[in-house]
Amino acid sequence: MNPNFLDFEQPIADLQAKIEELRLVGNDNSLNIGDEISRLQDKSKTLTESIFGNLTSWQIARMARHPRRPYTLDYIENIFTEFDELHGDRHFSDDAAIVGGIARLDNQPVMVIGHQKGREVREKVRRNFGMPRPEGYRKACRLMEMAERFKMPILTFIDTPGAYPGIDAEERNQSEAIAWNLRVMARLKTPIIATVIGEGGSGGALAIGVCDQLNMLQYSTYAVISPEGCASILWKTAEKAPDAAEAMGITADRLKGLGIVDKVIAEPLGGAHRDPVAAAALIREELSSQLAMLKEFDNDELLARRYDRLMSYGL
């Protein structure tokens, strides 16, 4: 099984393997097999469209966790210029599960903040698998207050299973750090745009998710608990995760229908990991458009609009 493809993608992986095999045979024997390769490529595209046009909520949840999916730093590299990372919460330490700093979007200074999971084992451990401790959220808060002070818009990228639930995090008051961020973000006198790029897990996501405009990538999720966690509570077994995912309404389209999400950003065929540069271009286009729209509001209008948006949830 190809580790770059999930189990429901394996028919696509098999076709891709055949295409690569034919290319190697053609190169070795100087054979003209272009027509056959083109036929298989068309078949692969059709198959991909068919599979991804009928994904279940559970399959989308697994796509949101795909090991090759672009992370915050990947998007920063492809969307922004002159990124200068800032470190530390000025209270305890620097949490690598949250990255942030000043950058430029369309030559305008912005503050970019996001979760970072890590690719290889050592980096995953260093970044705690994208699960921030209190110092991560306090770092994010410090950067957001700096952005307000210097009149910079704030752009956040959400991708976390949730806030870290370890003893050390609780000792440093994880819940207070999250709650304080919610309070601060609700009052910041600068535009805030949040984009869910992978997993939007519970309070760990909300802590950088209070905003004027909320986007979700097509194959991302946003929920109060993971499908496995929900299934374990309701059915006492994580094997019911597919049922839980469907019942919870965790996908971008479902949340858009509920009025929680403002914009669902399309992904390249097969997911953002198939073409990270194209995925970044789609996000950049949306961020530029939304930022131009939000700049039309003065501070009072911005805060009133944000308050009304938050109060509309559940109505």
Curated annotation (Swiss-Prot):
Family per similarity comment: Belongs to the AccA family.
GO cellular component: acetyl-CoA carboxylase complex
Free-text function comment from the UniProt entry: Component of the acetyl coenzyme A carboxylase (ACC) complex. First, biotin carboxylase catalyzes the carboxylation of biotin on its carrier protein (BCCP) and then the CO(2) group is transferred by the carboxyltransferase to acetyl-CoA to form malonyl-CoA.
Species name: Pseudomonas syringae pv. syringae (strain B728a)
Recorded catalytic activity of this chain's protein: N(6)-carboxybiotinyl-L-lysyl-[protein] + acetyl-CoA = N(6)-biotinyl-L-lysyl-[protein] + malonyl-CoA
Functional pathway: Lipid metabolism; malonyl-CoA biosynthesis; malonyl-CoA from acetyl-CoA: step 1/1
Pfam families tied to this protein: ACCA
Molecular function per GO: acetyl-CoA carboxylase activity; ATP binding; carboxyl- or carbamoyltransferase activity
Start and end residues of each CoA carboxyltransferase C-terminal domain: 40-293
Lipid biosynthesis is among the record's keywords: yes
Subcellular location: Cytoplasm
Assembly notes: Acetyl-CoA carboxylase is a heterohexamer composed of biotin carboxyl carrier protein (AccB), biotin carboxylase (AccC) and two subunits each of ACCase subunit alpha (AccA) and ACCase subunit beta (AccD).
Keywords for this protein: ATP-binding, Cytoplasm, Fatty acid biosynthesis, Fatty acid metabolism, Lipid biosynthesis, Lipid metabolism, Nucleotide-binding, Transferase
The protein's name in its UniProt record: Acetyl-coenzyme A carboxylase carboxyl transferase subunit alpha
UniProt-listed Enzyme Commission number(s): 2.1.3.15
A single GO BP: malonyl-CoA biosynthetic process
NCBIfam families: accA, AccA_sub, PRK05724.1
Broad class of the protein's primary localization: cytoplasm
